[in-house]
Design a protein with these regions (language model features):
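Hydrophobic/aromatic beta-strand elements that line small-molecule binding cavities or substrate pockets
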Residues: 2, 18-20, 48, 60
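Conserved short histidine dyad/triad with adjacent acidic residue
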Residues: 1-15, 43-44, 53-55
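Extracellular/periplasmic catalytic domains that process cell-envelope and extracellular macromolecules
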Residues: 14-15, 22, 42-43, 63-68
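Double-stranded beta-helix
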Residues: 39, 51, 59-95
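Short acidic-glycine-tyrosine-enriched beta hairpin
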Residues: 28, 34-63
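Residue-level recognition of well-ordered beta-strand positions that form the cores
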Residues: 1-3, 27, 75
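Solvent-exposed coil/turn segments that connect beta secondary-structure elements
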Residues: 7, 28, 55, 77-78
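Glycine- and acidic-residue-biased ligand/ion/polar-headgroup-sensing regions
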Residues: 5-7, 15-36
Length: 95
């Protein structure tokens, strides 16, 4: 499980295997692609499911000003690791 607090997002990254994600509480904000644009993220409310396809670039987190953190249960085949699209930048961003 992961908890994203308001105003924090991951940098664009991908995984070697599919990730299956269920939002347990709060609203999670997600986007696909290698270009970081937090204003273009899509809200995913509690109870929703997201499938991240292996090797597809994406980023996610909770937008600044959100009422609460988002808690997400993530599963998939392992072991795996995140591959940052731009390893010269931090793996998470304060937005």
């Amino acid at each position: 499980m992961i908890r994203w607090h308001p105003g924090h997002m991951s940098a664009p990254h991908y995984y070697d295997t599919d990730r299956l994600c269920v939002v347990l509480s709060g609203t999670w904000y997600v986007a696909s692609g290698a270009d970081f644009a937090p204003e273009e993220t899509v809200p995913v409310p509690s109870g929703s499911f997201v499938r991240r396809i292996a090797k597809s670039a994406h980023y996610d987190g909770v937008r600044k000003g959100a009422a609460e953190p988002a808690i997400i249960a993530i599963t998939g085949m392992g072991p795996t690791r995140a591959h940052l699209i731009d390893p010269s930048k931090p793996g998470w961003r304060h937005v």
